[in-house]
């Protein structure tokens, strides 16, 4: 195979890897934790990954404690857990 063909193949494989969804075993463990608003009484929009629905959902975060399945934006949640 020519060097141009090898470069094309390498590029296609790289693209394929970027487009392939993350399997549940490759997701960070905290993506499987339930959403946790924490004990504080704040009212902050946040997002968490719902592993059964396999999507990110909105919830109200109290502002303290909680757990790592807590994202400021839906895009951050999707990049981390639903990609």
Curated annotation (Swiss-Prot):
Location in or out of the cell: Secreted
- Where would you say this protein principally sits, based on its record? secreted
- InterPro entries with a match to the protein in the record: Kunitz_BPTI (IPR002223), Kunitz_BPTI_sf (IPR036880), Prtase_inh_Kunz-CS (IPR020901), TFPI/VKTCI-like (IPR050098)
User: Taxonomically, which superkingdom?
Assistant: Eukaryota
Q: Which cellular components does GO assign to this protein?
A: extracellular region
Residue ranges occupied by any BPTI/Kunitz inhibitor domain in the UniProt entry: 31-81
Annotated site location: Reactive bond for trypsin: 41-42
Q: Which residues cross the membrane?
A: none
| Role description | Serine protease inhibitor that acts against trypsin (EC(50)=10 nM, Ki=5nM), chymotrypsin (EC(50)=100 nM, Ki=40 nM), and plasmin (EC(50)=100 nM, Ki=40 nM).
- Protein name per UniProt: Kunitz serine protease inhibitor Pr-mulgin 2
In its UniProt entry, the species of origin is given as Pseudechis rossignolii
């Amino acid at each position: 195979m020519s060097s141009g063909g090898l470069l094309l193949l390498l590029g296609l494989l790289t693209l394929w890897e970027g487009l392939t969804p993350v399997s549940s075993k490759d997701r960070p463990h905290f993506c499987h934790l339930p959403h946790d608003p924490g004990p504080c009484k704040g009212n902050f929009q946040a997002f968490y990954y719902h592993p059964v629905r396999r999507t990110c959902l909105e919830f109200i975060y109290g502002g303290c404690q909680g757990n790592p399945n807590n994202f400021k934006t839906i895009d951050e949640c999707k990049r981390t857990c639903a990609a």
